[in-house]
Every structure is written in C-alpha cells, then in structure tokens.
C-alpha cells in the first residue's frame, strides 16, 4: 500500500463520511461530503446487493461530481451493518484516496484522543499523523467526524422515513 502524502491539511479539507444500513433487498449506502467540520457540500446515495460494499462505495465516489475534490474517505464500524464487509485497503486503491476507518478496520490500529474522548482507527494510504490531523480538522465535538455523524443521521432519516417534525412515516407491516 502506497502512503499518500497530503501537502497541507487545511481546516476545510473535503472528506466523505460513509454510512450504511441493511434493507430487505440489500444495503443502502449514504455518503456525505463535508469541508472539514464546517460545511456540508453534498450527499450521495447508492445500493449494494451483496454484503461486500467495497465496489459499491468505490463507484459511488468515482461517479460523484465531488470526486476531484474529495481528499479522504471516512468509515466507522458503528455506522455500518455488522454483516457488511469492506476492505479499506482495496477501497483506497480503487478510489485513489486514503481511508480512515474508525472503530477498527484493518491493521495497524491506532488510538486517537480528542477533548477527553478516545477512539481507535486504522489508516490506509496515509500516515498515522496525517490521519490524526484530518480527524481533528473534521471533528467538532468528541471523536466522530461531522461527515460521519451527518451521514448516519441522513441514513436514519431516509431508512426510517422520519419527516422534518421528527414523526416516523414508515408504513406499518
């Protein structure tokens, strides 16, 4: 795996946070593009028929109008289905962008601390120190980057059909 060197990590670095949830016909995948922890730039959606989401996420990102500006892909074990399989190394190679996987992922695993909280992560295609700088730039509070937090909220709203008033509109049965 080639380690990508990012020249400068600005507070407005564009990252994409990916969240997924199982549905009756496969896995719905949402990607949220954020500028650091400051602005939402876009929302992407795709579907994977199988449990290996690597190819579906790769294609979703490469087809996006944001592809040229996305510098890092953020994943979290806590925003993916338990049965889902994803290779952060293969994703990094396929998309040509580094991947930071919170909550584990593939070896090696590092620990990151922010404002009294800590999280473990793995980094593919980027050094540990660059990954920590990106996590710091893309996180407002705690240890969850804004892109991942908003991707999880968006997926939850779409999947559960919650309207703007917070009322669940999911049909019964």
Each PLM stretch: what is its role?
Residues 134-173:
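Charge-patterned, long linear interaction tracts outside catalytic cores
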Residues 50-51, 83, 87-124:
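Long, charge-dense
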Residues 111-135, 139, 148:
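Active-site helix-to-loop segments that bind/position phosphate- or nucleotide-bearing substrates
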Residues 24-72, 78-79:
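A glycine-rich, hydrophobic loop/mini-helix early in the fold
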Residues 1, 46, 53, 58-61, ...:
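Charge-biased, low-complexity intrinsically disordered regions
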Residues 21-24, 77-86, 106:
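Gly/Ser/Thr-rich loops at beta-strand to alpha-helix junctions
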Residues 2-23:
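Two-metal-ion RNase H-like nuclease active-site motif
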Residues 18-19, 71-77, 102-103:
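Short glycine-rich or small-residue beta-strand-to-loop segments that form or flank ligand, phosphate
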